[in-house]
Amino acid sequence: MIRHECGLFGIYDHDDAARLAYFGLYAQQHRGQESAGIVTVDKDGMHDHKSMGLVPDVFSEEVLRRLTGRTAIGHVRYSTTGSASQRNAQPFIAHFKGQDIALAHNGNIVNAAELRAELENEGAIFATGNDSEVFMHLLVRSLRHKDLPEAVAEACSRLKGAYCFLVLSGSTLVAVRDPYGFHPLALGRLDGSPVFASETCAFDLLEADYERAVEPGEMIVVDTLGEHSSRLPGPHPAKPRQCIFELVYFARPDSYVFNEQVYVCRKQMGWQLAHESTPDVDFIMPFPDSGVYSAVGFAQCAELPYEHAMIRNHYVGRTFIQPTQSMRNFGVRVKINPVRAMIEGKRICIVDDSIVRGTTMMTRVKKLRELGAKEVHIRISSPPVKFPCHYGVDFSSRGELIAAQCKMDEIVKRLDVDSLHYLSIDGLLRSVMHSDSFCLACFNGDYAVPCEGCAKFSLECKRS
């Protein structure tokens, strides 16, 4: 329903680096379904393959055999900056003074337009509309007088916004997370080799051990001398501002994100929601899959029957993964189908994780009405999304957001439901352990990194 920007994976010094990167990306396919790529490095240099499509469609056995080397980084992408085209697929590779540098990025750099203009005035040439390329230019410039870790740190000091980077060059792999820690990055261990991933579900698939989260503002350097951790230079915020939508929607429920168990958080959100507002209905039902875990918590707290009265077609991609509105509407129609026998004459409470634009909810409620539902009540396990996100989530203007454009009674009328209740911000924060460490800007407009005059970075190349 809502698109995220990407997922990262990296592994250092392992016999089967490319294949492990493949499965690490496969486990994080939910974070990006437009393109996928892997870069490996050996004594002969870098080897890469990237293309549009899902991980199993992009990589074959033949391709993986060609990606030789014991160190790899990988990327799955959804376009939040730059268009959905081959040239924007990552990882990026740059060549500088006989040195190859590969970059994979998760996030959104809010001052990228300003930095790009500065770089272009100094003669830089850009091939994509991607904010990640801005960082690559800064990195290469710093490499003129610094080694790779120092250059990464210097380049990061110019950035504002959200970023997790994996940077690979020769025998050095650098992992870095922005000082606010907007998006997750985890460190694990497989057969003694360090492994990095956006989500820990990648470690589970590989039977790697999860060690810890990469901390906000931390840079981890892995090279032939071992592993070294340091803090990025410059001032750091007193508290992180981690994206709570990772817990509400994006992350897989079997992942640990920001040192929180996603499954437990979502059940707690449902539990808190039921405490706030439980309608008189025959049963609780989720919209699979993202609403399932909140609905379980809601039903348990409310002591009401829980039914799977919506069946998902698992062979249809996420509604918002395709970038055109016509494809989005098609996805809404075919992705989920109600069980007719469960709907007619029933008073139903639908529990879902969020309403952003409202397109999906309107279509599904209409279908329930057509099948004879007596009452349809909606309970949402997050607060109303009223403000755009500048840090890498696909709602970049208030005009897209139904809660920003309509009052509650207007939303009820537009959705054609009998009642609607969103989880309060207080209820949301009671559902997590580290309640003072989250970005809530999409709910309350309190932006940690201002993006004045910028409805999210949009440097579309005219050639894209």
Please state what every model-predicted region is.
Residues 59, 128, 133, 306-317, ...:
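A conserved beta-strand->alpha-helix junction
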Residues 18, 80-81, 111, 182-183, ...:
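Flexible loop/turn segments at secondary-structure boundaries
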Residues 284, 291-298, 302, 306, ...:
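Extended, hydrophobic alpha-helical segments in both membrane/secreted and soluble proteins
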Residues 137-146, 288, 300-318:
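Amphipathic alpha-helical
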Residues 1-216, 221-281, 287, 375:
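Conserved short alpha-helical segments that host acidic/polar catalytic motifs at enzyme active sites
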Residues 124, 145, 278-281, 300-307, ...:
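Secondary-structure transition/capping motifs at alpha-helix termini
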Residues 303-348, 362, 386-396:
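Short, glycine/charge-rich flexible loops or terminal/linker lids adjacent to PRPP-binding catalytic cores
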Residues 156, 171-172, 189, 207-213, ...:
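PRPP-dependent phosphoribosyltransferase catalytic core
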